[in-house]
Amino acid sequence: MAKQPLTVIPVEAPVRKAQFDLYETIVDSLTACGATLRGGDVLAVSSKYAAISEGRVVNLGDVLVSPQAAYIAERYVMNPHLTQLVLEEADHVFGGITHDFNGTRVGFLLTYKEGIISPNAGLDRSNIPEGQVVLFPSDPYPTAANIRQEMKSRLGVDIGVILTDSWLMPGRSGTSGVALATAGFKPVQDERGKIDLFGNPMQVTQRGIADAICVCAQMVMGETAEATPLAIVRDTGVELIDDMLSVDDVSIPWEMCIYVGSLTKGLLEDLTPMIPVKSNGKNIP
């Protein structure tokens, strides 16, 4: 991977509320910002911006609420129309929580969607007119691949593309970037079998390269009123490939996931009494 410093270039673009030509907008925005894509660059595109370009915007008032959604919405203090959409969009719903936010009780469902564990199946109500919600792109990996192909056709450059989104790390406050989809380079670098500095063979380490690049891009793209749904990440050192990627290239079975596997097992087997507070009479450093 790269040893030279990374460069991250923010690219502002027009605010969109309905379906539009994403490829033309990207090219026009690059020109307006004086930014140039180079071969080997990675273009980060907000998954929400891509979804809006596909018309993936829903008026909540148009969503018919099922009895199941109404029950869950009441239990977790959620908008019933939003709850219905979550149930329709999620690949799996693990459960939900409610908590107080500035004196208001609010709730969320924890879901699995497109290989990502996230609240409310990734549905986004920010930076969109009130009463509307933005879904994920209909098919994220082909969307990323199409952006890559269009940039190659229109600008003559071979690049990588990531669709960026935000997620929450378990037990941590604050959102971070995650790559919803990748095109043009392997999103995960397998380090298993390699030798570390002390001669130890790596047994389980696989580096989330696409996610790491996404985090860099999110630093300049922002989350609120920045109007920067695009970013160029330069000198990542990724090797470009033409393979069609899918969620299978980044996801793992739930039983292999340290979070899902452990928490699911923990519902049946409480190991807390077996966990020592001290080791050999001394606090563990």
Describe the function of each predicted region.
Residues M1-P285:
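N-terminal and secondary-structure boundary signal
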